[in-house]
Design a protein with these regions (language model features):
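Structural microenvironment flanking redox-active thiols in thiol-disulfide oxidoreductases
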Residues: 1-63
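Short, internal strand/loop/helix patches
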Residues: 25, 40-99
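Short, charged low-complexity intrinsically disordered segments located at boundaries
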Residues: 34-37, 69-75, 104-107
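Thiol-/selenol-based redox modules, centered on thioredoxin-like
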Residues: 77-135
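Generic intrinsically disordered, low-complexity segments enriched for polar/acidic and small residues
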Residues: 19, 39, 43, 68, ...
């Protein structure tokens, strides 16, 4: 999100019409931990125009499959090494691994592609400008 915030600021300082078309959206793949309020606060810390969203596990699987993003809930090793961990401890002892791609959705709302790591603000800005000029 930080790199998207940088791109947003670059666009805001340049072409205001183009800047108005740029939208950053953080999609959390951990709805058990990430509330909409938390996501909204996190996303707007990078730009007041950014959104934070999530959904049910089924909806997230459908979305991530469509946009070539992988994610998996991974148990933390320290919880598994406890002699008799409680069910609560096991339920909360995980991380979520996920692809670090930036997904590009075109102005018509269709999946356009993605940008792999490492994320360079200038590459993202140029990609966005090129895409915006086609619509």
């Amino acid at each position: 999100m930080a790199v998207l915030g940088t791109v947003d600021r670059q666009l805001q300082s340049g072409d205001s019409e183009l800047a108005g078309q740029f939208q950053g959206i953080l999609v959390s793949v951990d709805p058990d931990r990430d509330s909409l309020e938390t996501l909204g606060a996190y996303a707007t810390a990078f730009s007041p125009r950014f959104l934070g969203v999530t959904g049910s596990r089924e909806d997230l699987v459908e979305l991530t499959t469509q946009v070539n993003v992988a994610f998996a809930k991974v148990p933390l090793a320290e919880a598994l090494t406890q002699e008799a961990p409680s069910p609560e401890a096991l339920a909360d002892a995980y991380t979520v691994d996920h692809t670090g791609n930036i997904v590009i959705i075109n102005p018509r709302g269709h999946y356009h592609g993605f940008i792999k790591l490492p994320h360079d603000p200038e590459t993202i800005r140029l990609t966005f400008q090129t895409l915006a000029s086609q619509f």
